[in-house]
Amino acid sequence: MPTVYFEDLQIGSVFLGRECVCDKEEMLEFGRRNDPWPFHVDEDAAARSPFGGVIASGGYIVTLWYRSLIEIYNTERASWAFLGGLEWHLRFRAPLRPAETLRAKLTVKDKRPWFTPDRGAVMLYSEVLKLQGEVVCTVDATVLLATRRGSGLGTTAVAGAEVH
């Protein structure tokens, strides 16, 4: 499987993750275990809430976002050379309801060499989108990726994720 290194990513590149469905039972169970507000776990109470029905917890939305990103970061086509995340800034824009489908859209906003030559910082902007185009959540993230030098490879890797 090819590896995507710091040098392989181009500013402005856009990647689309796989579609993920908000499964009602999974969403409710996540809410019961992790975020038990009535509008996440109780359909009757949620119907009387400002949301007019049960909605996904922000934590569950982040889980689906990450599932969608796996299509970009780590598939049989390519694996990104992640060393770690430095920071995330999340903004929730719209509720996610059962049976709605979403996918992640990831844009490389900027990249900079790190303090050591074996890695680089990549600034990413991600939108979690419903299929109709409504933005559920946005994420600004800065991550560290290995360089080819840091991996010990001197050859150019082929980026395998689908670019749109």
Language-model segment annotations:
Residues 1-10, 95-164:
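HotDog/MaoC-like acyl-thioester-processing domains
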Residues 19, 65, 92, 106-108:
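Conserved hydrophobic positions within beta-strands
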Residues 86-89, 108-110:
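Acidic, glycine-rich active-site loops and adjacent beta-strand->loop/helix elements
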